[in-house]
Regions:
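Short, flexible boundary segments at extreme N-termini or domain junctions of P-loop NTPases and their
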Residues: 1-35, 154-155
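Glycine-rich phosphate-binding P-loop
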Residues: 29-52
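Extended hydrophobic secondary-structure segments that form protein cores and membrane-embedded regions
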Residues: 31-32, 92-94, 170-177, 220-225, ...
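Short coil/turn segments at secondary-structure boundaries
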Residues: 44-45, 104-107, 131-133, 185-188, ...
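Short acidic, Gly/Ser-rich segments with clustered Asp/Glu that frequently serve as metal-coordination loops
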Residues: 95-102
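Conserved C-terminal guanine-recognition region of P-loop GTPase G domains, centered on the G4
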Residues: 111, 116-212, 216
């Protein structure tokens, strides 16, 4: 009996090692998008090296150089998310949130064939009408690409071909900066499984339903990327929905 148990443990350990090596070679491809100043760069920095992140000044927000009349997309980089004793390799890129960069969201998402999309918003969607409208418009833009294949007209023939076949496995709405908006009511809603009914989620519900009807799973997570609050858990729980 002991021999069989030992053999079982060895096989399980070998399977876990094989899965980890596979992910080292082929990490989860994740897209991180959302409006400007919502915390995407902070999230990318935290995933690169965990720890408290210095606030990023407005004048230092992410921008992209222009070449031949087009904004240049940055290269995605490998990272490892450590959670509950396990390491999960991922690849992400830091892309600006201004509307002139939305085509880069589409390019990154489709060209890398990302299986998970994180759309990051912050507390401004709760108290600023312009910020909420901008965030909803950005989320709708991505949803239209995924559901209706409304890709940018600037796409090359090969990219258009990829776009017609592209569909992520999961789209997660990340409510960032929870250190600014989280309340006892928020905690109660999370505890009761009602996070999708939170007022910050309400403006995005219609497009989340559109994604679900197109066989794309959706998730809602709360984080404070600047302080690393719930970041690893949010990423891994979403990946596990694949």
């Amino acid at each position: 009996m002991a021999t069989w148990m030992l053999a079982g443990h060895i096989l399980m350990g070998s399977a876990q090692l094989a899965a980890y090596v596979y992910r080292l070679i082929r990490p989860h491809k994740i897209g991180i998008f959302g409006p400007s100043l919502a915390g995407k760069t902070t999230l990318d920095q935290y995933l690169t090296v965990p720890g408290d992140i210095d606030p990023i000044p407005v004048e230092m927000r992410t921008t992209h150089p222009v070449k031949n009349g087009s904004f240049q997309i940055p290269h995605a980089t490998k990272k490892q998310v450590r959670w509950k004793g396990e390491k999960t390799p991922i690849m992400t890129a830091d892309i600006g949130g201004q509307s002139q960069y939305w085509n880069l969201w589409a390019e990154d998402m489709i060209d890398r064939n990302t299986s998970v999309v994180f759309f990051v918003v912050d507390d401004r969607v709760a108290w600023s009408q312009p910020a909420m409208q901008e965030a909803v418009a950005g989320f709708k833009y991505l949803t239209d690409i995924i559901v209706n294949h409304r890709f940018p007209s600037t796409f090359s023939r090969s990219m258009k071909k990829k776009a017609k076949k592209y569909k992520p496995k999961v789209v997660c709405l990340v409510l960032n900066k929870m250190d600014l908006w989280w309340t006892n009511e928020s905690q109660q809603m999370w505890d009761m499984g009602l996070r999708r009914q939170h007022p910050m989620v309400t403006p995005f519900q219609e497009d989340m339903r559109r994604l679900r009807k197109s066989a794309v799973a959706t998730n809602v997570e709360a984080t404070a990327a600047q302080y690393g609050l719930n970041v690893e858990g949010a990423v891994i729980r979403t990946i596990n929905m694949i």
